[in-house]
Amino acid sequence: MHIAIAGNIGAGKTTLTKMLAKRYGWKPHFEPVDNNPYLEDYYADMTRWSFNLQIYFLNKRFRDVVEISKSKDTIIQDRTIFEDARIFAPNLYDMGLMSERDFNNYTDLFDLMLSLVKLPDLMIYIRCSIPRLIDHIQQRGRDYEQTMRIDYLRGLNERYERWIKTYKGHLMIVDGDTTDFQDNPQDFKRVTDMIDDRLFGLFPME
């Protein structure tokens, strides 16, 4: 089974992935951040490095999806291949940070990859406001994120909302503004109750 966590930068995807992996005994797949050779350069000069970064993520995410499809374990994934192609790359293009040539090349490659993979069994989307995202980003203190532009973050959030309205797979939405799953056990239980209902309830997903 493939469970995926989606959400903007700072939404709490990695935290929730770790907590759910521990709670259910699922195998976690985390977003490759610490060893990413492009990330610091990208935040310093987005126009120069946007295509390189997005191809790096697309490659890693596609590899993850292929591995997940072959696994007999239940995998919970921190961020998905769909977010790269439907959120981040188009946002960079619209902001003038990725050329039309690079964007078209990227999109063609993603469409080919998408024809070879299936949707996750359950997509969990963490919805957060901009102030909440900024608070989380400041708390975790990654140097390369501190120079992030607010309009960049806002553009991503708007794209997430448009994308999630058109998503065709099994979907569960967590309100990240009102649900403190990290520090409030009752809030975390509410999240797991929702998951239990969808995966193991009387009328589970088909």
Q: Which residues does each PLM region occupy?
A:
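Conserved lysine of the Walker
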Residues: 13
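A glycine- and Lys/Arg-enriched "phosphate-lid" helix/loop adjacent to the NTP-binding pocket
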Residues: 87-159
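Glycine-rich phosphate-binding loop used to anchor ATP phosphates in small-molecule kinases
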Residues: 49, 53-118
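Hydrophobic anchor at the beta1->P-loop junction of P-loop NTPases
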Residues: 5
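Conserved substrate/cofactor phosphate-moiety recognition/catalytic segment
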Residues: 18, 22-60
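P-loop (Walker A) phosphate-binding loop of NTP-binding proteins
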Residues: 8
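NTP-dependent small-molecule kinase module
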Residues: 134-206
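Pre-Walker A (Motif I) flank of P-loop NTPase domains
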Residues: 1-2
